[in-house]
Curated annotation (Swiss-Prot):
GO cellular component terms attached to this protein's record: cytosolic small ribosomal subunit
Annotated protein name in UniProt: Small ribosomal subunit protein uS2
Key words of the record: Ribonucleoprotein, Ribosomal protein
GO MF annotations in UniProt: structural constituent of ribosome
Ribonucleoprotein in keyword set: yes
Domain of life: Bacteria
GO biological process: one example: translation
Gene that produces this protein: rpsB
NCBIfam families membership: rpsB_bact
Listed HAMAP family: Ribosomal_uS2_B
Record's signal peptide: none
Family: Belongs to the universal ribosomal protein uS2 family.
Gene3D superfamilies: Glucose-6-phosphate isomerase like protein, domain 1, Helix hairpin bin
Length: 254
């Protein structure tokens, strides 16, 4: 069983929002306080978002569907790939190609082409064609692989999508909403939580925070067949929480 503590969230810098001037007013309900012109997120609501997301993910997996991991920003890209691979889920961590969901059949054709080119590399085809042709095929293969490798084994639309930085991934959200695919996302103070089915208030810039949230989703997938849930430990009261919160230069404004 996964155990999440408020202290672990604090240590990962989950509570740090953006500068006050960058607030999306729709995030006000998730704000705990303000320190040095930086918004502090309400970790009680973060814990609730984690719990709701954990339950949704496990429901999706038990119904035989997959969760698509999406995070293309620098801080998230490598983590998204690692955790998606760990839980054997599809992922997009370089660039979202318009239509990856809404025009899925066309995307599948591109994936099939990628698989065909990869097969040519190992079945002896390269030995029967010119070096120039091999070079052209390799260039095309690399171009396709850059954006499609993570979804090569996604045979159907996902049952849910997990997103780091929904403000950046607006095209993903638009496509998912049109198709009725549930969205789980880490929402920072500059995001719109109203377009997310399971918003998790949190810092989407700090690597430790991104890693923590992504690991939680991956753990939920891996534990879905064990009939176990998540244990939330609120091991800090409000007074302790306030004393722990010291806004430092732990996030880079972008």
């Amino acid at each position: 069983m996964a155990v999440i503590t408020m202290k672990s969230l604090l240590e990962a810098g989950v509570h740090f929002g953006h500068q006050v001037k960058r607030l999306d007013p729709r995030m006000k309900r998730f704000i705990f306080s303000e320190r040095n012109e930086i918004h502090i997120l309400d970790l009680q609501k973060t814990l609730q978002g984690i719990k709701d997301s954990y339950e949704l993910v496990q429901s999706v997996i038990k119904n035989g569907k997959k969760v698509l991991f999406v995070g293309t920003k620098k801080q998230a890209s490598e983590i998204i790939e690692q955790e998606a691979k760990r839980s054997e889920m599809p992922y997009v961590n370089n660039r979202w190609l318009g239509g990856m969901l809404s025009n899925f059949n066309t995307i599948k054709k591109s994936v099939q082409k990628l698989k065909k080119l990869e097969k040519m590399e190992v079945d002896g085809t390269f030995e029967m064609i010119s070096k120039k042709e091999v070079s052209q095929i390799n260039r095309e293969k690399l171009k396709l692989a850059k954006n499609l490798t993570g979804i090569k084994d996604m045979e159907e639309l996902p049952g849910a999508i997990f997103i780091i930085d929904p403000k950046r991934e607006q095209i993903v959200i638009n496509e998912a909403r049109k198709l009725g695919i549930p969205i789980i996302a880490v929402v920072d103070t500059n995001c719109n939580p109203d377009v997310i089915d399971c918003p998790i208030p949190g810092n989407d810039d700090a690597i430790r925070s991104v890693a923590l949230f992504t690991k939680i989703i991956s753990d939920a997938i891996l534990e879905s067949d064990k009939e176990v849930g998540i244990q939330i430990v609120e091991n800090l009261n409000e007074e302790d929480l306030m004393s722990e919160i010291e806004v430092k230069n732990e996030r880079k404004e972008s």
